[in-house]
Amino acid sequence: MKFNIIFTPGIVKYLRLFTLSLLKYSSCSFRLISNGCSQEEDVMLTSFCEIDTKLEYYKLPFEGLVEHSVAITHLQGIEDGDYFCFMDPDIIASGDFIVQFKPLLEQYSGVFSGTVIWLDKAGQTLSHTEKIMGGRFNITEYGLCLGSTFFAIYNNKILSNYLENTLITFDKYNSWENIPTDCQAKLIQSNLKMQRYDTAKVLNILMQRDGEKFIFRHSHHLYHIGGLSSLLVGPLSKVKQRGFIRGLNKISSRKYLKQIITRRSITQTKYIRRDVADYFTTILKALFEGKKLPPKFRIQDQKISQDMETARQLIVQMFDEYHHLLNL
């Protein structure tokens, strides 16, 4: 089983470390995708892929950086394996994650995972009051799986046949106005009419409407930081910089942290994402530059607090064990 991992400008140097954890704890192979990366980063990826036969380098045939949905559509088009798999580059593994998913592939056409570590169950559940189906939503309040582009495994034959027969792709139908009337009718019947849909949401909903079975399953061996790509890309991020020092000052406030976890608006969720991404980016840069690590990010929610601390420890342990492979 081969996973596509898409690297964007600014993250190659640091997030190769996360790929090493995937290699360490699974028998899977990984295709590392250059999406608009610089020549220096492409060389870095190419050299990195030479350390293990389970690694493969691939550069997207587009000019510059393209949207995630466009990249996924292209990658599915060239996939000739039994499964089409992809995951975000800022997911670090603590154990053999694939063992949990293999039995599910006999029952489901799509298996998803990889929720970001700072998001609780309520933040992953789409309520009927929402107008935008963002990427963080993996299930509706009625129990329908919405899937995820954080970590996805599709039965490639079933997916390819569906895409060919319906002409729906990962990069189409992100806004209501662009959705054909027959597909709109199915979404209305499912009580899922939205202003906008994140990548693959419409595809996943319609495939299930037409009889396929999908499931989202949390993995105790995958820790998804979330937001590192957009943070390190810098100017290409849609969220304003807020500053890590400002974040550390507020991080010490339990009241503020409680507000972070309970906020649900899209704008606020982006800021939560940036606060956590700021924290882990600072950890990575400190490790790679031989500097002191930042204070721990403490959150009142015990589950989220523990997951963030575990992710921090994993990053430090992986760096101590494998930094010699990163050509620092």
What are these regions (language model features)?
Residues G147-L248:
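Catalytic core and acceptor-binding pocket of nucleotide-sugar-dependent glycosyltransferases
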Residues C28-Q39, L60-P61:
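Short beta-strand/loop segment that forms part of the nucleotide-sugar
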Residues M1-L17:
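N-proximal low-complexity "stem/linker" segments adjacent to membrane-targeting elements
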Residues E40-E79:
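Active-site-proximal specificity loops/subdomain of glycosyltransferases
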Residues F84:
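Short aromatic/hydrophobic "clamp" motif used to bind/position activated sugar donors
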Residues L20-S29:
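Short, acidic, metal-binding catalytic loop of nucleotide-sugar glycosyltransferases
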Residues V99-C183:
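Conserved catalytic core of nucleotide-sugar-dependent glycosyltransferases
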Residues D88-I92:
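The conserved acidic donor/metal-binding loop of glycosyltransferases
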